Amino acid sequence: MIDSIHVSQAGVEGPSPWWLKGGAIFIGVLGLLSLLNAVSLALGGIAMDAMMGEMDPEEICAEDEDTEECEDFIESIAQFSSMPLWDIGAAFSALLFLLSIPTTILLWNAEDRDMALKFAWGWVFVHAFSQFYITHEFLEWYGTFFDSIPIEDFQWLTQFTSFLSYGGVLMCELTLAAGLVLISYKTRPPTKLEAPSAFHVNNE
């Protein structure tokens, strides 16, 4: 039976700072990608509004055999261009970029581990929420878009796309969380306490 814990007299080797620095590099790269995504979403929303402003549903559908279906299709495109996804998605991406700056600095300096990890977890939370929001908003429109297409054989595609989209986002966010858990574990404060091996217990 183990009845004691020894305190090592040898020097305690601290965790490698490159675990935190590696996290800093990763979040820094994702932060730059978030900035590009914010710009693309903002420009995409402006381009969609400009395109829809030049479209006349009555003129486009005038020669179509089924005018009502054509107008429904144009209306679904108009709904896509007016979705808050463009503005809110761009705002989320910009927030991720701004949040990545202090997170990257704290992780790279590796001076305040607890604060750096709190910022990192906050960044992961915002990233997960934004990705699920964007995916949800897009799939909501996607379902409406397919409802406007009278092709019953392809109606299953909306459920299949939803499964893949939500599943992909979930796997991505779980991977980010798992990586941060690993960094937290590898950078935990060292200790001099040593538990004696069970294989060397003296039963006398």
Enumerate the predicted regions with their spans.
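Topology signature of small-to-medium multi-pass alpha-helical membrane proteins
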Residues: 2-204
